[in-house]
Each structure stands twice: as C-alpha cells, then as structure tokens.
Amino acid sequence: RPTHDQKKIREIEMSDSAISATAAAEVDVALIGAGIMSATLGAFLRTLEPQWSQIVFERLDAPAEESSSPWNNAGTGHSALCELNYTPEVRGRVKISKAVAVNEKFQVSRQFWSYQVNQNVLPDPREWINPVPHVSFGRGEEQVSYLRKRYEKLANHPLFPNMQFADGRQKFEEMLPLMAEGRPETDKVAISWTDAGTDINYGALTKQFLAAA
C-alpha cells in the first residue's frame, strides 16, 4: 500500500507526448523532483530527443520549492569570480587552474541558456539572470597579501574580465558598507571584485523551463 508521502507525489507533464502515469504503462524519461536539475535535463532531452515522452514527479505543491528556491541557495552565477576556495595558495603561489575550469563550465551553461532564449524556450531572461558585482574580502596582513596575489593572477585572464583590487578603507566602505560599519579603522582590509558577475534565480529559471515543456 502506498504511504501518505507517496500519495502526495504529484505528476507534472513535460512534453506534448507525455501523459500521466495513471494513463500510461511507461514513459521514456521519469525525472524525480521538479527542481533546476530535472528542468535542465528535461530541456536538454527535449532538444536532443524531442520525440521522447517525459514526466516529473514532485512531492511539494509547486516546482522549485526546495534547493532551487531563491531563498534556499546563494543565487550566484557560479563562475569562481569571488570564491576563494578555487584559488588555493601553495608555497606562496596562487593556483588558478580550478577557478578557470569552474568558470569554463559556467560559460557553457550561459551558452545553453542563450540558445534556449533564442529558441523562445526561456522568454524572460531578466527574471532569472542579472548582472551583479562579485566581491572577495580579506582581513589582516596574510589575507590581504593573498588577495593581492590572487588578483594579479586573475586580472590578465580573459575569463575574469575587469578584475579590480583595493586595499583602502574608502572603496571597502563603498562596496561593502554593512561589513565596514563598526569595523575598527586599524583593521587592515582589502577587496577584489569584478562587475562581470551574475545573480541567478534558479527558481524562476526552473519554472520557465517547465512552463515551456
């Protein structure tokens, strides 16, 4: 017998050829969870195999209500512009190979999204992608030195355009006023940033993908 939770699972049709599981013996693709991962995979498959039927199973009342919700994730275009863990310092030298690899993958995502926009699958890109500066922060001699080295390595790479660096209070207070407020003037701080960053609303992106299915 199905449990209470199983009874709550909802079916979302994703293509003209998809029909509910109660009326069909099988479908070509069953996607579990109506979040960004299922929506993206479904969009890929509709492009590559448009004759395949698809169905999404979701336990909640609407798609993109868990990790894909804009309130439940950072919402950044994940391109290693400000994430310091992708640029470790090893024996005094900053390594950027991982940051480059992550950025390249994000550019592939942007190409796919652009194609979907051009195909009118995603009708309103401003609803889910917008420019926003990505900023890194360092405090103390060691972190400031690291941030400067990181900036120097990334500044000349084409995947990290318009990278900037400042180790004075004025730019810090301008860019990060809430972090600057109440901080002692004696604190040695630095920031690096680029205006090439993006803010992504994965919930809105998910819903546009599913609405077009």
Q: What does each model-identified segment do?
A:
Residues 5-29, 47-51:
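Extreme N-terminal leader/targeting segments of oxidoreductases
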Residues 27-55:
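N-terminal Rossmann-like FAD-binding beta1-loop-alpha1 element of flavoenzymes
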Residues 33, 58, 138:
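Short beta-strand/turn micro-motifs composed of small residues
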Residues 38-42, 106-114, 206:
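Short, hydrophobic/amphipathic alpha-helical packing segments
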Residues 46-70:
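Glycine-rich FAD pyrophosphate-binding loop
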Residues 70-74, 181-182:
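Short, flexible, mixed-charge acidic loops at enzyme active sites
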Residues 75-175:
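Dinucleotide-binding Rossmann-like beta1-alpha1 core, especially the glycine-rich loop
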Residues 125-136, 174-213:
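Helix-loop-beta segment of a Rossmann-like dinucleotide-binding subdomain
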